[in-house]
């Protein structure tokens, strides 16, 4: 992101935001609720437009492309904090619905569905309506749906919110393994610092519409500005 700024009326949301994500890197975005983390994702996928700035992927400004074209052209997968699936469909039918949009060849489509079912260990819940799945199962489903198009960039919005400790650990391990297996660039936003810093390579801290700190987890927790803006003086990862 280069010099991204956004305001709603007289309220400044983002002010000259600059950061980059390297290929195959996991980047975390930290900050309290309402600081603009999810807004950055909405800018990337095209739900809103910035007042100023550029979002560059593979040397091209994604802002030059409409929302319908953007995610497929730049291979962006998006996992929203809430929803992201068809409530009344079974888990299997959710996967089929997305595959029919993204994969033309029927054989390739079925192969990809089978792979995702196996990879996410979904065999036992294929015929359960999505609305009856647990929080962790829903999250696994939506991530699987986001991976259907083989994304190079994966956006995870508040993916640890309202989940129990064991489910969070499972998702952390899944995120790290996806990076290793697929070399995907992954961006995670969350306001729970400890959960996020346990599985990212680098992170940024947002405060007062700006990026106030960036670095590895160990660098950030010792950063004076990050402590003042977010962590506090006694924060530790473990």
Segments from the language model and where they lie:
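The feature captures the beta-strand-to-loop junction immediately N-terminal to the Walker
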Residues: 30-32
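Conserved ABC ATPase "signature" region
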Residues: 96, 107-125, 173-176
């Amino acid at each position: 992101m280069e010099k991204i700024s956004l305001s709603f009326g007289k309220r400044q949301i983002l002010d000259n935001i600059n950061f980059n994500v390297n290929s195959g890197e996991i980047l975390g975005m930290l900050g309290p609720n309402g600081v603009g983390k999810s807004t950055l994702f909405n800018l990337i996928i095209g739900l809103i437009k910035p007042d100023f700035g550029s979002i560059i992927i593979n040397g091209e400004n994604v802002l030059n492309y409409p929302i319908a074209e953007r995610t497929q052209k730049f291979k962006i997968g998006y996992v929203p904090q809430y929803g992201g699936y068809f409530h009344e469909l079974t888990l299997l039918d959710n996967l089929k619905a997305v595959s029919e949009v993204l994969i033309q060849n029927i054989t390739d489509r079925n192969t990809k569905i089978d792979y995702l079912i196996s990879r996410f260990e979904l065999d036992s819940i294929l015929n359960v309506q999505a609305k009856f799945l647990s929080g962790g199962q829903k999250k696994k489903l939506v991530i699987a749906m986001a991976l259907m198009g083989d994304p190079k960039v994966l956006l995870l919005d508040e993916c640890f919110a309202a989940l129990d400790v064991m489910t969070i650990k499972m998702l952390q391990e899944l995120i790290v393994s996806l990076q290793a297996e697929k070399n995907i660039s992954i961006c995670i936003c969350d306001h729970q610092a400890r959960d996020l810093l346990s599985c990212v390579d680098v992170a940024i801290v947002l405060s007062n519409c700006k990026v106030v700190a960036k670095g590895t987890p160990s660098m950030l927790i010792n950063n004076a500005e990050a402590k003042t803006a977010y962590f506090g003086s006694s924060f530790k990862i473990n």
